[in-house]
Amino acid sequence: MNGCCSQDPTSKRLEGKVAVITGGASGIGACTVKLFVKHGAKVVIADVQDELGHSLCKEIGSEDVVTYVHCDVSSDSDVKNVVDSAVSKYGKLDIMFSNAGVSGGLDPRILATENDEFKKVFEVNVFGGFLAAKHAARVMIPEKKGCILFTSSNSAAIAIPGPHSYVVSKHALNGLMKNLSAELGQHGIRVNCVSPFGVVTPMMATAFGMKDADPEVVKATIEGLLASAANLKEVTLGAEDIANAALYLASDEAKYVSGLNLVVDGGYSVTNPSFTATLQKAFAVAHV
């Protein structure tokens, strides 16, 4: 009879596994690359940020465990190439983490949303996710096992006054995840999403118009804004927290978890911040 705690707390949770991480050169992706390698995985970083990608490989320090491949996730040939490169170099593909994404503009008004911007966000966030899953499934189905992950957003769990292109693209990604889970489960392949609250990343800095600002100023400014809106206080969500969620879903600890949208938002999506704030004000007035 197996014990209920069979996992060695010091073990490498992805030992022997091979992963592709799109958008892996910076932000959540880069943090996940480092964590996956730490836990024994061999990782192919897929990104369009060539300098950052090569720099990350150099930082990790061994081509035996990490490789960079230029990949525009909206290009079928690029995505096919990165999957084929992983199989050619490391012999297989166990994990596809479709993490690449763009935010588009911050303006939440539909009349201010440019058609080309809307299409571009869908091209990267949705079509890019579709291509990642399609080419991962191509090599996973014959092996009758595998794990496909998407980075979604808590904005797809609720309606928020956010940019339509970004929010709707994440809703679409969640739908893709569910459909793939139903189809690919028949081949032993698990499919899940990780949906974070706001995290300070280069993508978010760009969305806030702070791409070239001092990193410490960016961090303090955006974290302050996020903290004021957050439901869970006294703790800050970081890229490492999303990487840890991805690690769990990619590991054998989650071997029977599929079709899940793991929302990492401190309970934000199950609350009504505006109503809560109104009640708090009313309570304060009543007890003056």
Curated annotation (Swiss-Prot):
SUPFAM superfamilies: NAD(P)-binding Rossmann-fold domains
Active site: S153 (proton donor), Y166 (proton acceptor), K170 (proton donor/acceptor)
Keywords from the named record: NAD, Oxidoreductase
InterPro entries registered for this protein in UniProt: NAD(P)-bd_dom_sf, SDR_fam
Gene Ontology molecular function terms on file: oxidoreductase activity
Residues bound to substrate: S153, Y166
Binding positions for NAD(+) per the UniProt entry: S26, G27, I28, D47, D72, V73, N99, A100, G101, Y166, K170, T201
EC numbers on record: 1.1.1.1, 1.1.1.-
Tissues expressing the protein: Expressed in mature seeds.
GO BP terms: terpenoid biosynthetic process
Catalytic activity: 4,5,8-trihydroxycasbene + 2 NAD(+) = jolkinol C + 2 NADH + 2 H(+); a secondary alcohol + NAD(+) = a ketone + NADH + H(+); a primary alcohol + NAD(+) = an aldehyde + NADH + H(+)
Pathway: Secondary metabolite biosynthesis; terpenoid biosynthesis
Subunit and interaction comment: Homodimer.
Known function: Involved in the biosynthesis of macrocyclic lathyrane type diterpenoids (also called Euphorbia factors) natural products, including the cyclization route from casbene to jolkinol C, a precursor for ingenol mebutate that is used to treat actinic keratosis, a precancerous skin condition. Catalyzes the conversion of 4,5,8-trihydroxycasbene into jolkinol C in presence of NAD. Also mediates the formation of casbene dione derivative and 4-ketocasbene from 4-hydroxy-8-ketocasbene and 4-hydroxycasbene, respectively.
Record family assignment: Belongs to the short-chain dehydrogenases/reductases (SDR) family.
Record's protein name: Short chain aldehyde dehydrogenase 1
Native source species: Euphorbia lathyris
